[in-house]
Regions:
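Short, amphipathic, aromatic/basic-enriched membrane-interface segments that mark the entry/exit
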Residues: 108-119
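Membrane-anchoring alpha-helices and their flanking helix-loop junctions
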Residues: 1-109, 123-210
């Protein structure tokens, strides 16, 4: 199978993970069922969603090698570490405020949520970028990261933010104006610069494609 097509087909696994997360809404209608199955379904959905991020870089594909690969590997380690930190810190803060159901009763604007509105998603994106770079997986860097970003933006724009706007109104709108969605501007500039650099290296043949 073409390695690019194989990377794209990982989207099927992402969708299964999202489907399990959607099932949580069914369990929420039955408090007893949610207590028994809710946590298991949520964790299974997260595990399945993370599978392409972790496994796709091991598929046959073009690799960044040599000194260039070592340099990007360092960037990947830093990005992955930051991603894990974001996920852990944001999850602990959410658990503290919202409880085991992870449904906040009011808008969370303190701590890491005062820096970015969706810090768990920020962490997932940083981890996806970093893990691909650690293994020098050029197709995963572009394709898997692209899929993850599109899915998370879709969840934010079409599901989560409309719900927050409906229930919290002006309070959420003010928070949205004040706090960036995923990345502060300097970090966004660094990520864009990284992507452009990768594109230039591919275009000039410094990173060969198979």
């Amino acid at each position: 199978m073409n390695p690019i097509v194989k990377q794209i087909l990982w989207i099927r696994v992402f969708l299964i993970g999202l489907g399990l997360q959607a099932m949580l809404e069914l369990f929420r209608k039955d408090e007893r069922a949610y207590k028994i199955m809710g946590t298991w379904v949520r964790n299974l959905g997260i595990l399945i969603f993370m599978m392409p991020i972790i496994l796709a870089p091991f598929d046959a594909q073009s690799r960044i090698e040599g000194i260039l690969g070592a340099s990007f590997r360092i960037i990947g380690i830093i990005s992955s570490a930051l991603g894990i930190i974001f996920i852990i810190v944001a999850s602990k803060h959410l658990l503290k405020v919202a409880g085991s159901e992870q449904i906040p009763r009011e808008l969370i604007t303190d701590g890491i949520y005062g820096k970015v509105r969706n810090p768990i998603y920020t962490g997932v994106i940083l981890l996806t970028i970093g893990w691909s770079l650690i293994w020098g997986a050029i197709y995963s860097f572009f394709i898997i990261t692209g899929i993850v970003v599109l899915i998370l933006l879709g969840l934010i724009k079409f599901l989560e933010e409309p719900m927050l706007k409906k229930f919290l109104g002006d309070k959420f709108l003010e928070y949205r104006k004040r706090v960036p969605m995923l990345f502060p501007l300097p970090v966004m500039v660094v990520i864009i610069a990284l992507v452009i650099t990768m594109i230039v290296f591919v275009a000039t043949g410094l990173i060969p494609l198979i």
